[in-house]
Amino acid sequence: TDSVTIVHNAGQSNQLSEHRLDSNRNHFMEEVSAIAFGDWHEEFDYQFATAQESRNTYNGQGDPNDFMGPALWPSSLSHFAEENQDPGGLLGSHIDMLHESPLGMGIAHDSENVYWYYDGYYGELVRYDFQEDHDTGEDDHSDGKVRRYSDVSLTRVPGIPGHMEMNHNNGILYIADTGAGRIIWVNTDGPGVTTNIMGDETQMEPLAEYSEVTGVEWGILDSGLSFPSGIALHQGVLFVSQNGNGKITGYNLDDDGKGVTRSRTVSTNAGSIMGLEVGPSGKLWYVDSQNNKVIRIDPYEDTDFDEVRDSLDVYPNNSLLWSDSDGDGYADQS
């Protein structure tokens, strides 16, 4: 719907939601697929950026021209979808956009106005730096810096986002590579070889930098998944949703973030599970696209990972000897 639904006081008794549509959404938010919040801005509050699964047809009004990529927005509710909403004026409330990646499937914030982007059209990872925003509704993008990480091959599945998550403590970026059925990690702080590709046919506008980066460190965290889509990181656990079977897996990560010490999977009744996020209270939320719902999971503590909650487990730290298979509140002995 090229729009944003804002849920206020989520999960509370006074919860309410509103639906906002920007006047220029048919380009700047056409077929929006993913969202990532960034740094605080004294005028715009926390800025956020969106990915668009579009080749830029202005909602079917024209032939695709592939002039598409990430858009930057203000989260301030006095700016977003409020400024420049009259026809014939400035270009809505967006505050920047770059256009080298049609069919965007995922996005993650790095720092300042730098975002990582899942380029579904060219099938690779791209780093976008908007640098200074151009203010609401303007169109000067010439200070943008774009780097294509061509070693990181990604496979798009139409209609299923491949979300991304950055660990800001160590620079490891996690990507749901949906079509390949895997979760990959990329060391964004590691070395690489940068080549100037200014003037390449994939460049769609004047830029301050356009380059290709090769030789980066990356790897596979897990594979054999059924269309992984949502992804969220919380206290050393990476949560991943699988659109193909409605399951969510939590991966306890190694100290370096490149491997897994253990994992657990739960099933949901989602018709088409997609995005994940951990809220301020530490509870996991997921999107069910088919049923048009946002669902919260209220977890229980299970220190020993024996699938018996600590409140019912007589010996919660010993998963080899104790469990409560009949749910009577007493430990089984075997």
What are these regions (language model features)?
Residues Y174-R182, V186, S211-D255:
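Loop/turn-rich, solvent-exposed surfaces of beta-rich toroidal or solenoidal domains
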